[in-house]
């Protein structure tokens, strides 16, 4: 469905435009003719990460871990990892990474199982993303949690082009620093 002509006509009579999308979409709209005083407010492609200090994490109460996991779930899953606040990477710092990771991901998995519905389109796109990442990255290991609603790629700390590595529908990348 190409609405380019409609967008061009609306742009010609706009005093302001709010442009929201990836860099390609923003650039497409910027090329359209607009009135001289038209103001563009852009929300282009963003990239979010999470950094967890495992030495502090192990000292959290179960209630605080559950609260943190819920916030991670809301930032990631409610927008299918397509919002600017949705983390793609989780960087773990500290000596207690392995025990912290298990506890964190188990909590996320539990919340996902209770609150997230997965449709056929999402399953297909997640598989497509999985194959694409398998081809393009050097993974240490891949962790599937139960029914595949949470997928974690563990990557060495030598990452090239991090901005091009993206998860979708519960696919995350983690690095131990």
Each language-model region and where it sits:
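Conserved NAD(P)+-binding/catalytic subdomain of aldehyde/semialdehyde dehydrogenases
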Residues: 1-90, 94-95
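NAD(P)-dependent aldehyde/semialdehyde dehydrogenase
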Residues: 66, 70, 79-177
């Amino acid at each position: 469905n190409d609405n380019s002509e409609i967008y061009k006509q609306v742009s010609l009579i706009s005093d302001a435009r709010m442009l929201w999308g990836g860099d390609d979409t923003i650039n497409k709209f910027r090329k359209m003719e607009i009135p001289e005083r038209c103001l563009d407010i852009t929300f282009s492609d963003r990239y979010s990460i999470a950094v967890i200090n495992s030495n502090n994490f192990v000292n959290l109460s179960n209630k605080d871990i559950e609260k943190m996991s819920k916030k991670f779930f809301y930032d990631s899953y409610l927008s299918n990892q397509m919002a600017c606040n949705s983390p793609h990477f989780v960087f773990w710092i500290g000596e207690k990474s392995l025990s912290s990771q298990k506890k964190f991901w188990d909590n996320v998995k539990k919340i996902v199982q209770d609150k997230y519905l997965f449709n056929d389109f999402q399953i297909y796109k997640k598989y497509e993303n999985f194959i694409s990442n398998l081809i393009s990255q050097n993974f240490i290991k891949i962790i599937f949690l139960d029914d595949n609603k949470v997928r974690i790629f563990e990557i060495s700390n030598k990452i090239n082009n991090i901005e091009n590595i993206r998860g979708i529908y519960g696919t995350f990348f983690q690095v131990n620093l």
